[in-house]
Structure formats: structure tokens, C-alpha cells
Amino acid sequence: MTIRRALVGLMWSLAVTACGGGGSSSTPSTPAAPSPVSAVHYTALGASDASGVGSSVPCVPFTTCDAGTGYVPVLARTLRATRDVTLVNLGIPAAVLSPTVYDIGHRYGRDIPADFIARELPFVPSDSTLITVFGGPNDVNALADAVEKGAAGSDLRGYLDTQIRAFGSDTDRLVQGLRSRAPSAFIIVINVPNMAGLPYASGYSLQARQVLQYLSVGLTRELNRQNGRGLVIADAMCDPQTYAPGGFASDGFHPNDTGYAGLAQRLASIVASGTSSASASCAQMTIVPPL
């Protein structure tokens, strides 16, 4: 943990003088995906998924890890079949997307090393032509943990709705920052699976799973709202492949090699087509009875 925090702190201190601030409130058109033969400057924002935790060859944070079997290096290798690819992997294990959730997590004793806006966004290279963002699952778990510790008081739904809106505002900031830092990048945002349907939650109480589901669907809708605002959405929530039992590591939370390979293939298909859409509703949004 000390080493991880030191790495994150070092990267942040190096970036303070190198990175500009702020984003634009405009709504840009979505840049085109890289052509099948053009060089790709790929930047990945994420958490332990970006490092391939749960795979047979996980990666040390902040390395290109060419032989890794997480979705980031697998996608990079897939794209290299037809073009040159430069990879910058900014994923920080256990990070959350939202600084609001980061603060809540620390308030309730959860060890969260970073959020995407403070510790990943400042390092996005301006020449990025492809960016993937996968955040939200750790945010869901951190908020559910806060609920378990009494954060919601007597108004559970009111508390959850407030945090979902705050996540949406933080997502706005992240997307605006990405568009400002890398205006030519084709951005793919992966939405949040229904965490109540993942194996790690199978032994939880019904109410705990209902909270996970409510948060997962709420955060996914906030991410989906960004579709067409200069990016496209990869729909993990409504893709049955996301929940395939054979795609998970032994912890029931992270994908294994099969799960990561499937995600990499879906992302490669989006890069190839230049388009993607997310469903407004699907059966996977109600894996357990609604809260």
C-alpha cells in the first residue's frame, strides 16, 4: 500500500507543473475513431481492471506491460496487428472515478488511493487518439459500504439519489477535462455492470444487493448520459457476456483472462466501427427485485 501511494504521489507531483486546468462547457462532436492504418496513441483510465488484476499476467501500474492479459494490453496488441500503437496506462488499483466518492470512502474508513480526476486526468497526453475509461464499480462498492456503516440515515433512497447525481457531476468534469486535454481523441467510456449480478455479491443479503443494483443502474445512467457528448459508450451493463460465470477470477469481482479478452474484443469492435450505443433499459438492470 505504501509503494502504491508513493507511485501515485510521485506521478501527481510531476504533473502539477505540466498540466493545465479546466475544461470547456461546450458539447463537441465525437472525433472519428483512428483509421485501420493510422498510428494510435492509446491512453487508458481505470482502476485494477486496467492493470489486469484477476488475469494470469497482471501489470505493474503505470507500465505498458506488453505481455499482460488484462483488457488494456490485449486491446493494444489487437490494434498493433494493423498499425503502430503507443500505450499510456494510467490505471490505479482501487481508484474511484469520483472525487466525491473518494471523500465519502475515506470518511467511512475505506482505503481508496486515488480518484480519476485528481490522479489520472492530469497525465492524459495531449496527442492521445484513443482513450478508454472504465470507472464506477469501485464507486458502487464504496458507496454501498458507506450505506452499510449508516451514511444514509433514515432516507436510503434519498441518500443514494444524491450520490448518483454527484457522480454524474464528477463525470461531467472528467469528460470535459478529457476533451480539453486531448481534443482529437476517440473516447470510449465503459458503463457499470450490475454489481448485484456479479459472483462476489451472490452471498450478500437481498437489501445489500438491492443497494448495489440501485447504485449500478444509477451510475450507468449518468455515464450513458455522456453518449454523443464527444464520446461513445461501451454497454457493459446490458451485455449478457459481462455476467458469464466463466469470465470471472476467483474473487468473483475481477475478470479472468476470458473476461478481459471479451472486453478487449468489444472495445476493438467499437474502434473498428467508430460507433456504439447503450440501452436505456434491459433485463440486467433488474437482476434482483428493485429497491
Language-model features, listed with the residues they occupy:
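Oxyanion-hole/transition-state-stabilizing segment in secreted/luminal serine hydrolases
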Residues: 53-55, 107-165, 194
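C-terminal motif of bacterial Sec signal peptides marking the signal peptidase cleavage site
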Residues: 16-18
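Structural recognition of the beta-strand scaffold that forms the well-ordered cores
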Residues: 41-53, 86-91, 129-134, 139-141, ...
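Bacterial N-terminal signal peptides that target proteins for export
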Residues: 1-8
